[in-house]
Amino acid sequence: MVGILLRVLAIVVVLFALAVIAGPFLISSEPREGLASNTEAAMAESRFVRIPFAGTAGLAVHYLEPPTDAPSWATPFLLLHGFTFNAWTWQPALDAFAARGRVVAYDQVPYGLSAKPARADWDGPNPFSKEAAITQLFAVMDALDLERAVLVGNSSGGTLALEAALARPGRVEALILVAPWVYVTRPTLPATVASLPQMRRLSLLIARKLGENGPLLDLSYADASAITDGRRERFAIHARVAGWDLAWGELLSLSLSTPVTVSEHLVQVQVPVLVVTGEMDRVVPVDDSRRVAGQLPDASFVVIPGCGHVPQEECPDQFARVVGDWLDARRIGASGR
């Protein structure tokens, strides 16, 4: 009897191992069909610029830029969205920034309507790496004639803003970090493991779930019932563009082996910083944002009551007041009053 049980157990173990090894190969790696180009999916307010990137023929970057009556000398603002979001996360706040200077919100590659390069599209650095995101940020600034700017980053966009300020402080006037994703507790895998075919297929599956179902949008609001149909439409606009799922899968696969280490360098940030968070943030704990502000040499910290992870969307009036008061106190840009 014991021998039979051991044989059955051995068979179960073997079947489980085969499922783990072979199961991910059941996930299709073919891109979603019947989708449009980024320009075909564009909205009336959409703009595009092509930036150089090593090993490619250039990358198309989608951005939003409202008109401004601010004086030409006013410092411009460059707005950086978070993971799975896009430039439209800043739409409710664009006019408030435009009252103080030129403002540009762009889709980081491969989000929104920006380029979604497939592996065959590049022969050089990975366009989805942290280093690539920094390079692309400054390439956008160059292409749009932004010599120096205030970087405004939400969530992982705040991480990118910090990395950019550390890399090229001479081009950053100040930072506004909205619930920055700095103290990350997620595990990372060795590159050899993350690059296994099975892991790449699983990354693709997760990317599709995140991109098609949009769970992070609801999680980012204190009150998800406030999310309009129009907001959901723009959040998911990437899913209209051919190759979006493969590009997101590539980014997610790479992130599995890329630790977030910017917290180790906060004391080196040389510019003034405003850290803002929502009182009811369920993505980045309020204490994490407070801790970021405490580690920076020159930072202010504000909590906006009743808001979640994206106060610029959910509480735009309060957000604009907090940011405006800080900019006025620091005498950065033109006054919005």
Task: Describe each model-derived feature in a short phrase.
Residues V269, V275-T277, D281:
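Short beta-strand/loop motif that positions the catalytic acidic residue
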Residues P52-A57, L64-A70, Q108-V152, R321:
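Active-site loop/oxyanion-hole signature of alpha/beta-hydrolase fold enzymes
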Residues I27-S28, P187-A191, I206-H265:
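Conserved alpha/beta-hydrolase catalytic His-Asp/Glu region
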Residues M1-T75, R100-G101, F128, L146-E147, ...:
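Alpha/beta-hydrolase fold catalytic core
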Residues D298-R337:
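Catalytic active-site module of serine/aspartate enzymes centered on a nucleophile-bearing elbow/loop
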Residues L166, A174-L205:
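Flexible "cap/lid" loop of the alpha/beta hydrolase fold
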Residues G153, G157, A161:
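Gly/Ala-rich beta-loop-alpha elbow adjacent to hydrolase catalytic centers
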Residues P66-K116:
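Conserved HGGG/HGGXW glycine-rich cap/lid loop of the alpha/beta-hydrolase fold
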